[in-house]
Amino acid sequence: MDTAMQLKTSIGLITCRMNTQNNQIETILVQKRYSLAFSEFIHCHYSINANQGHLIKMFNNMTINERLLVKTLDFDRMWYHIWIETPVYELYHKKYQKFRKNWLLPDNGKKLISLINQAKGSGTLLWEIPKGKPKEDESDLTCAIREFEEETGITREYYQILPEFKKSMSYFDGKTEYKHIYFLAMLCKSLEEPNMNLSLQYENRIAEISKISWQNMEAVRFISKRQSFNLEPMIGPAFNFIKNYLRYKH
């Protein structure tokens, strides 16, 4: 039996500003358009031979609308809920054939629907620090800068990297270890307008992002209590670092 642990690394940029209207530090967060559980299911990142509890947990972590979508057994609709019109034909056919083999051929989806019906509650769409997977031979910092621009539209000249700050965290889910690495940046004054509406400006920037906004520490705590991923362990130290940075800067 294969018991090897799989490592998935994501690298991000915690970008902060000082809101001059309320004198509070804020950071940019993005909200995913779909849950991690839904993405893992569509991309077949699970074992059909795993115990049913593991699969039910996956469905528990989907939103209600996502579970309803899976119950249609229409893989095209599931796939384009994530990819929209992105041309990924080879990957699509590979994942569709696996979905068909796992769920459609044995009993025309009856087991899948039965498992979904056992799910309770519902997952939420995560608010996250902008991050993503590094490309081959790409440095950690280069990846963080690239992913931040892709998800927010804000280019490199508008912020300053604070190189003394670099934090990482890891967590495990089954046989997968997820490692997140974060750098820290301070926004330049030219983009510090408190009423700058990032949601309207960049919401269509990338297919996987549905919303983007500035959040202070109180909001970060509120968001963290309502979702499975806690943002405080990374953003809290980043805000403290920014406070000290601004104190010594002035």
Curated annotation (Swiss-Prot):
Decapping enzyme required for the removal of the 5'-end m7GpppN cap tethered to viral and host mRNAs to allow their decay in cells. May therefore accelerate viral and cellular mRNA turnover to eliminate competing host mRNAs and allow stage-specific synthesis of viral proteins. Acceleration of the turnover of cellular transcripts may even promote the shutoff of host protein synthesis. In addition to the mRNA cap, g5R also efficiently hydrolyzes diphosphoinositol polyphosphates. Interacts with host RPL23A. Residues 97-239 form the Nudix hydrolase domain. SUPFAM superfamilies: Nudix. The keyword RNA-binding applies. Mg(2+) binds at residues 138, 151, 173. Keywords: Early protein, Eukaryotic host gene expression shutoff by virus, Host endoplasmic reticulum, Host gene expression shutoff by virus, Host-virus interaction, Hydrolase, Late protein, Magnesium, Manganese, Metal-binding, Multifunctional enzyme, RNA-binding. A motif (Nudix box) lies at residues 132-153. It comes from the Viruses. Belongs to the Nudix hydrolase family. DIPP subfamily. It catalyses: diphospho-myo-inositol polyphosphate + H2O = myo-inositol polyphosphate + phosphate. Induction: Expressed early and up to late in the infection cycle. It is found in: Host rough endoplasmic reticulum. One of its GO terms (cellular component) is host cell rough endoplasmic reticulum. It holds the Pfam family NUDIX. InterPro entries: NUDIX_hydrolase-like_dom_sf, NUDIX_hydrolase_CS, NUDIX_hydrolase_dom, Nudix_hydrolase_domain. This is mRNA-decapping protein g5R. The active site is at residue 147. PANTHER family: BIS(5'-NUCLEOSYL)-TETRAPHOSPHATASE [ASYMMETRICAL], DIADENOSINE 5,5-P1,P4-TETRAPHOSPHATE PYROPHOSPHOHYDROLASE MUTT.
